[in-house]
């Protein structure tokens, strides 16, 4: 899991 802006969550 990678967290971007804090409001956006991307599943890798």
Swiss-Prot record:
TM regions (residue ranges): none
Recorded superkingdom: Eukaryota
Keywords, alphabetical: Adaptive immunity, Cell membrane, Immunity, Immunoglobulin, Membrane, Secreted
Gene Ontology biological process terms from the UniProt entry: adaptive immune response
Entry's localization field: Secreted; Cell membrane
GO CC terms in record: extracellular region; immunoglobulin complex; plasma membrane
Coiled coil region boundaries: none
Subunit structure: Immunoglobulins are composed of two identical heavy chains and two identical light chains; disulfide-linked.
Protein role: J region of the variable domain of immunoglobulin kappa light chains that participates in the antigen recognition. Immunoglobulins, also known as antibodies, are membrane-bound or secreted glycoproteins produced by B lymphocytes. In the recognition phase of humoral immunity, the membrane-bound immunoglobulins serve as receptors which, upon binding of a specific antigen, trigger the clonal expansion and differentiation of B lymphocytes into immunoglobulins-secreting plasma cells.
Protein name as it appears in the record: Immunoglobulin kappa joining 1
Protein species of origin: Homo sapiens
